[in-house]
């Protein structure tokens, strides 16, 4: 039995309490996204810049757009004027480019650093060791036009909840170690298949798509 978009969002909101919900809009029609918007949802996320810019033109102006996919440096300029949060900053080269484009647009762009916590090699992100060195060197403070709000991570794509929770717990522990020094407020963990486990492990923001539209 399929549920309506409104019913699915209502159920998710009841499950997650005060955790921030960002709706992943990839592969979805404008009609479907408007149904989500009508539930007072304003935070939407895309994996690809081309889709993000296209949907921004077609959707209401008060939507807060998040970038959650692997971002090429040559595409940053297309989203720099308006992006609400780039959650997938996975390398210093990209951080430099975001800072440069933010400066051109006379703004400060909020970001999360993506941390590689999964067993799969194809997932992107900094290692925790690399990040610890970056934070200890205070390198981040050089980037005046980005605001680092916290971390993002993706668990291994598995049905083994023990593995998922172990990876999320590892990231939560790293987040807690640095959050006071770095003034972090956001820990983005959890998608359609694992957001319950992510919240149990301290996530403050979840990225949900297919669970809403099923």
Located regions from the model:
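Conserved alpha/beta-domain cores
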Residues: 1-193, 199-201
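Gly/Pro- and small hydrophobic-enriched strand-loop and loop-to-helix capping segments
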Residues: 203-214
């Amino acid at each position: 039995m399929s549920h309506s978009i409104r019913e699915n969002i209502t159920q998710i909101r009841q499950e997650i309490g005060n955790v921030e919900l960002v709706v992943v809009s990839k592969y979805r029609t404008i009609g479907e996204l408007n149904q989500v918007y009508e539930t007072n949802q304003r935070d939407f996320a895309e994996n690809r810049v081309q889709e993000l810019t296209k949907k921004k033109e077609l959707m209401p102006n008060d939507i807060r757009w998040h970038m959650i996919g692997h971002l090429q440096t040559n595409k940053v300029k297309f989203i720099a004027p308006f992006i609400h949060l780039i959650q997938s900053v996975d390398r210093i080269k990209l951080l430099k480019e975001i800072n440069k484009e933010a400066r051109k647009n006379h703004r400060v762009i909020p970001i999360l650093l993506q941390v590689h916590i999964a067993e799969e090699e194809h997932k992107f992100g900094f290692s925790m060791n690399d990040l610890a060195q970056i934070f200890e060197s205070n390198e981040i403070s050089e980037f005046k036009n980005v605001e680092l709000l916290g971390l993002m991570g993706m668990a291994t794509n598995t049905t083994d909840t023990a593995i998922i929770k172990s990876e999320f717990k590892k990231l939560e522990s790293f987040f807690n170690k640095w959050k006071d020094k770095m003034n972090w407020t956001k820990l983005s963990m959890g998608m359609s298949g694992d957001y319950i486990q992510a919240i149990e492990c301290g996530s403050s923001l979840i990225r949900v798509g297919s669970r809403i539209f099923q």
